[in-house]
């Protein structure tokens, strides 16, 4: 592994996104979409992948298996088995509440999750807002309590390999990610 590959690995451990790495290393004025995907491809080629860990909601007082998950590059190993060969769907939540994006999008996300479950799908939510109903522990089969970013959503898709991704119910943030174009 060359020194630039080691720097890439260390940058991921330190919390830099593929987008930030592309912007600082490749070109601040270049084609950011293309360069972001180049960094992603190189990272995956080197096996630099996020680990999925459970959020410990009981301060280690006793063993607890929650469906609250997060991704990190700081450790290795996985706390879950992925739904790769199962019927599953990812729903992108609304993120933070703000003017123009509020509880109505959370209501849509919750309804999408409930409908998916009624149809026999394992439900996977990606959302980082603890004030939403969609992040309640019993609302979905898995909750990735993580950022709604292009990189993070693609990481979940790569690991879980869902049958589909519902983008349209979460409001502007998920709609702006253009996830569909990345997998064409």
Residue ranges and their predicted role:
Residues 1-3:
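Short, small-residue-biased leader/transition segments that mark boundaries at the very start
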Residues 7-9:
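Short, recurring structural edge motifs at helix starts
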Residues 11-14, 20-27:
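Extended, domain-scale alpha-helical bundle/helix-rich regions
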Residues 14-15, 33:
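Residues at alpha-helix boundaries and the short loops/turns that link adjacent helices
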Residues 19-20, 51:
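Residue-level signal for secondary-structure boundary elements
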Residues 29-36, 41-181:
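ATP-binding N-terminal substructure of ATP-dependent carboxylate-amine bond-forming enzymes
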């Amino acid at each position: 592994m060359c020194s630039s590959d080691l720097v890439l690995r260390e940058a991921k451990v330190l919390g830099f996104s593929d987008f930030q790495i592309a912007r600082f290393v490749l070109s601040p004025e270049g084609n950011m979409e293309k360069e972001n995907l180049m960094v992603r491809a190189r990272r995956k080629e080197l096996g630099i992948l996020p680990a999925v860990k459970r959020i410990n909601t009981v301060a280690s007082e006793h063993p607890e298996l929650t469906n609250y998950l997060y991704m990190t590059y700081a450790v290795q190993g996985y706390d879950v088995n992925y739904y790769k060969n199962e019927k599953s769907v990812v729903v992108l939540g609304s993120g933070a509440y703000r003017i123009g994006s509020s509880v109505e999008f959370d209501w849509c996300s919750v309804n999408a999750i409930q409908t998916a479950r009624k149809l026999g799908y394992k439900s996977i939510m990606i959302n980082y807002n603890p004030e939403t109903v969609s992040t309640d522990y019993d609302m979905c089969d898995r909750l990735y309590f993580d950022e709604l970013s292009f990189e993070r959503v693609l990481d979940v898709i790569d690991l879980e390999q869902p049958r589909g991704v519902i983008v349209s119910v979460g409001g502007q943030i998920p709609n702006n990610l253009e996830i569909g174009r990345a997998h064409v």
